[in-house]
Amino acid sequence: MLKLRIIAPDRLVFEGDVESVTLPGTVGSFTVLNRHAPIISSLEKGKIVYKEANGQSEVAVRSGFAEVRDNVLSICVEL
């Protein structure tokens, strides 16, 4: 499983293990899966959709940055 951390300036939005995450990148949406290669990307207005073992959730964002490293996806967002 991929570890996901979504952080806003005022709070931790989500932290947990997920199967996949789809992000609104500035050059198009992209999906991060378990054992993804390291990457840093800016995000634009849209939805972050993440799939857990028991279902799917989404978070609307205005902008942000995402980094994948060592099977951890850290996302800093403006909500």
Task: Give names to the regions the model predicted.
Residues 2-79:
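Compact, glycine-rich, soluble single-domain proteins
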